[in-house]
């Protein structure tokens, strides 16, 4: 893995009316023609994303969205796509033109962002600005002469932070605007947390069991495995990697027992049998459940297995899109394990990527992947969506551990924090 995973970056969404200058601003900030720019309204259709670095924020993903007032034939669908972006971003940039007053649509969207607890940065596009103007021109009293627009509409500053104003067609203020944007505080950034928080100390040995089967990507490890190795290194620990069959050999060569064994969830049953009972064991998926979401809710959700009857509706949701293999964990192995444990005649439904139903009240159980490709904000939204609608939700690792009768062992490394939240296994 040579770049920061997309899910671990700060996600910044750009919003505003058609021809406000969103695409022009993005092209100026990235110094690349990321988005199509035209005087014709509605040139941005589906959201367009670009990964880059904005210091001191660090690695980010910026997303251009369709105009909020798109009245074209597909305008409603484009606006719906923009609304989906709100659920995934950590920071919003709202673009207004200095020659047009804010509209009711502008205020509605600004309030919509605020209601979703997304910090908002206002950028004012100075149409026909002179070359002498800059992002922050001050008069003799030190007042910002470019922000008179916002002064005229005080409702704006009550909702959003005014970052700056300039002519987006000019690159002269690019670095200034990048500095201003980089100094903002985004919402709920994953990078501020740790996948192995409280589990690894300097010098600790951690064994990672990484099965290589037909579903494994050729020539590389999967993202959770790579992220875990990096986390161990960051904590000055020792990362040892093997496949399931080599675990006994690796354990026999150690003079001291490892601090923790972490396995791919699909190998839980075999690794549990091979790992001595006095060595803590968990899985990459359960680590992700703790890192990305709410482990307590996901572990509580597994109790719904006791109530599954023939004909029950079960949603199995993947956060990424990949080609299904003959031993795919979501569409093949989990249904097989459920059937082996007596959960027969279930109505299984599947989603992948960004698809996730708004109404999940009709499901008896939601089984979600580890969500390594989704932002923490999106994972929390999905969990909250299920909890609010009274639908139990569990993730792959927790479910598989429960089906193999080892849930208590698999979550034992986290019992202190679960106990503090009043959890009962």
Which residue ranges define each predicted feature?
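C-terminal end of P-loop GTPase domains and the immediately downstream helical coupling element
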Residues: 166-233, 238-255, 316-317
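Conserved G1/Walker A P-loop phosphate-binding module
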Residues: 1-76, 84
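Switch II of P-loop NTPase G domains
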Residues: 43-49, 65-89, 95-113, 190-196, ...
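G-domain G4 guanine-recognition motif of GTPases
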Residues: 65, 96-99, 120-135, 146-152, ...
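C-terminal effector/interaction modules appended to NTPase cores
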Residues: 17-23, 219-425
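Conserved GTPase G-domain signal focused on the G5
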Residues: 21, 130-131, 155, 162-188, ...
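Conserved hydrophobic helix-helix packing surfaces used for dimerization/oligomerization
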Residues: 12, 206, 312-314
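Conserved C-terminal guanine-recognition region of P-loop GTPase G domains, centered on the G4
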Residues: 54-58, 77-163, 221-236, 246-250, ...
């Amino acid at each position: 893995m040579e770049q920061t995973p997309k899910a671990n970056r700060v996600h910044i969404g750009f919003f505003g009316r058609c021809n406000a200058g969103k695409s022009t601003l993005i092209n100026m900030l990235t110094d690349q023609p990321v988005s199509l720019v035209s005087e014709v309204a509605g040139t941005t259709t589906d959201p367009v994303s670009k990964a880059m670095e904005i210091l001191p924020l660090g690695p980010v993903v910026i997303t251009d969205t369709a105009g909020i007032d798109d009245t074209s034939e597909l305008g409603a669908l484009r606006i719906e796509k923009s609304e989906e972006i709100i659920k995934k971003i950590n920071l919003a940039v709202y673009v207004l033109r200095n020659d047009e007053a804010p509209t009711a649509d502008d205020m509605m969207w600004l309030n919509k962002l605020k209601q979703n607890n997304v910090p908002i940065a206002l950028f004012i596009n100075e149409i026909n600005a002179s070359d002498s103007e800059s992002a922050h021109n001050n008069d003799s009293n030190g007042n910002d002469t470019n922000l008179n627009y916002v002064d005229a509409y005080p409702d704006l500053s009550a909702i959003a932070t005014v970052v700056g104003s300039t002519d987006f067609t000019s690159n002269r203020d690019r670095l200034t605007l990048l500095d201003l944007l980089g100094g903002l505080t985004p919402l709920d950034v994953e990078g501020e947390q740790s996948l192995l928080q409280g589990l690894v100390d300097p010098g600790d040995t951690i064994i990672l069991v990484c099965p290589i089967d037909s579903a494994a990507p050729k020539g590389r490890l999967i993202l959770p495995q790579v992220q875990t190795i990096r986390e161990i290194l960051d904590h000055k620990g020792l990362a040892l990697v093997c496949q399931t069959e080599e675990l006994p050999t690796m354990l026999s060569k150690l003079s001291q027992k490892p601090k923790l064994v972490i396995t791919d969830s699909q190998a839980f049953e075999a690794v549990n049998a091979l790992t001595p009972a006095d060595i803590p064991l968990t899985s990459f998926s359960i680590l992700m459940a703790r890192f990305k979401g709410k482990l307590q809710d996901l572990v509580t959700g597994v109790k719904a297995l006791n109530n599954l009857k023939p004909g029950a509706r079960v949603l199995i949701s993947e956060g990424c899109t990949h080609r299904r293999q003959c031993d795919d964990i979501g569409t093949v192995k989990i249904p097989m394990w459920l059937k082996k444990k007596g959960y027969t005649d279930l109505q299984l439904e599947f989603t992948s990527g960004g698809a996730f139903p708004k109404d999940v009240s009709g499901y008896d159980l939601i089984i979600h992947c580890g969500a390594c490709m989704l932002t923490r904000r999106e994972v929390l939204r999905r969990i909250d969506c299920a909890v609010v609608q009274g639908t139990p939700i569990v993730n792959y690792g927790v479910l598989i551990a429960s089906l193999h009768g080892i849930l208590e062992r698999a979550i034992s490394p986290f019992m202190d924090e679960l106990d503090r939240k009043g959890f009962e296994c």
